[in-house]
Amino acid sequence: MEITLPRVSLSLAVLLVIVCSVDAQNYLAFPRMGRSGYLAFPRMGRSHFKSETSADVTGCCGVGIKNEFLIGQDGKEEIRSACGARADCCEGLKEVVDQKNDGVYFSMCVPDITFAQASSVRSSEVFNKLKSLLEK
């Protein structure tokens, strides 16, 4: 068997292809091991940036929870806001304040009856559905 330049170059090319394919399989098969991100899926976790809520985009709160007012066991008061701090309910919605069984006060935006008469949505139905979701 004679060693010639074409045979050596072909053997080296095949060897290079095999090494590259084996190396790439590790990245494609196990994307979170080693250098995650190279030829793999993006990081699947929480973003470092705050997501845009409906209040940030439209300047008002849509149907649903607007704020929660909690009093901790140590007496510390905390307000959790789902919308912007000073955002009002969107047009056609009114703000309703209520209290959960555990003593947490919350405000939510529900359809206004006078505005919703043009549609088939009743404010009391939406309010009861949202309230039942909160109690779960």
Curated annotation (Swiss-Prot):
Q: Where in the cell is it found?
A: Secreted
Q: Which residues form the propeptide?
A: 47-136
Alphabetical UniProt keywords: Amidation, Neuropeptide, Secreted, Signal
Stretch forming the signal peptide:
1-24
A GO term from the CC aspect:
extracellular region
- Please explain the role this protein plays, according to its UniProt record: The cardioactive peptides enhance the contractions of the auricle in vitro.
Official protein name in the record: Small cardioactive peptides
Query: What is the source species?
Result: Lymnaea stagnalis (Great pond snail)
Lineage of origin: Eukaryota, Metazoa, Spiralia, Lophotrochozoa, Mollusca
